[in-house]
UniProtKB/Swiss-Prot annotation:
Annotated protein name in UniProt: Photosystem I reaction center subunit VIII
Chief subcellular location: plastid
Organism superkingdom: Eukaryota
Record field: transmembrane: 6-28
Topology relative to the membrane: Single-pass membrane protein
Family: Belongs to the PsaI family.
Cellular compartments per GO CC: chloroplast thylakoid membrane; photosystem I
GO biological process: photosynthesis
Organism: Nymphaea alba
Job description of the protein: May help in the organization of the PsaL subunit.
Subcellular location: Plastid, Chloroplast thylakoid membrane
UniProt keyword terms in alphabetical order: Chloroplast, Membrane, Photosynthesis, Photosystem I, Plastid, Thylakoid, Transmembrane, Transmembrane helix
Classification via SUPFAM superfamilies: Subunit VIII of photosystem I reaction centre, PsaI
Organism classification: Eukaryota, Viridiplantae, Streptophyta, Embryophyta, Tracheophyta
């Protein structure tokens, strides 16, 4: 794997991973506090 291919794989991974972690943490936070 060259340095040119690394960003093209890294950017979508971070772009999908960050919102996923944010939604999961928010979901568990709501479940724990019973805001719903």
């Amino acid at each position: 794997m060259t340095d040119l291919n690394l960003p093209s794989i890294f950017v979508p991974l971070v772009g999908l991973l960050f919102p996923a972690i944010a939604m999961v943490s928010l979901f568990f936070h709501v479940q724990k506090n019973k805001i719903v």
